[in-house]
Every structure is written in structure tokens, then in C-alpha cells.
Amino acid sequence: LKYFIKSFLLFFIPITTLLANQKPYIVNFTRDRYHAANKNWSIGEDEKGVMYFGNDIGMLESDGMEWKLYTTPYSTLIRAVAVESHQTIYTGGSGELGRWDRDNTGRLVYTSLTSLLHDKQSLDSQSFWRIWIDGNNVYFQTFSHIYIYDHRTIRKLSLPNGFLLLQKVRNEFWVQEMFGSLYQLKNGILHKAQ
């Protein structure tokens, strides 16, 4: 028994010491390195490991070594990012929603989707906080509305008191009405939770 205890301690103590010294590899990138504003709102990653960040002055793209800043024509801040693929990224910010597609040189080119809205003036005071991709639908969420983009049109969902943040839980989309009930968003339709 003494031999077993000594052997166990001789084996266990060095391993716990090694494990205790392991620190996660974290790199802090300052704004001097990525050449944009200091506030980043959201993060997305594509299938190639390229990261995208919603920033106060545009969208940042980083492969871990290089940084690229993309701005919208109106230089709007970008609060929400959703990555469909390396070729297509959706963003939303203050009064603006759109998509970025890669051109033949690999650069991202912005297309505003606001022209698809019937009531563009309602966007003036709104900010997009969440974007989710669900098959052929893209959900853009403000506190007032959820906009559903189907690659051709945009339609708007509303509730009397507006929305809290739209969340994805186990491949289902859920949102709470501000000061109200919980709803499931399924196939572009809000269903009140029972």
C-alpha cells in the first residue's frame, strides 16, 4: 500500500503541476493593430477560419495575421454580423442592413438591402442587434421589428411592444416580446409559446 501511495503521488503531482501551468493562448489586438474604432460589437467566423467583427466604423476581417477594414457607403457602424460563407456576410447597424459578397479579386463588396424595404424611414431610428441565418431566410432583428430577407424580398414582423434579443436555441429561434410573452420564430411566423 505504501508503494502504491508513493507511486501515485510521484505520478500525480508532476501531472497536476504541468496542467496547472497551462494557460490559454490569448492575444489581445489593440486598435492600433487593426486600425479601426476601439468598440467591436459582434463576431462571426467563416468555414476557412476567417473572423469578421462589427465595429463602430465598419466591418473588420482578419485571418489571424492581417486585418482589413470594410466600410459601408454611409460609414455606418456595424453592430451585427452573420456569416453565411466565406463568400457572403450579412451586417446590420444604425439604420442600415446589407450583405457583403466577394468579387473576383477576393475583396468584399457591400450591397445595401434597405431598398427592398417598403418603409425605409422607419429604419432611421433603429439599430440592428442580431442577425441569424436559417436556410434561405436571414433574420435581421431590431428592438422594434424582425426583418426577414429571403434573397429577393424583405418582410417585417412586429409585436405591439417590440422585441428583446432573438436567440437560437437547439436549432430553434426564440424571441421575447418586450415586457411580454415568449415566441418561437418558425418558417418566418411568430408562434406564442404555450
Positions of PLM-derived features:
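Carboxylate-rich, polar loop motifs that coordinate divalent cations or form catalytic acidic clusters
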Residues: 1-194
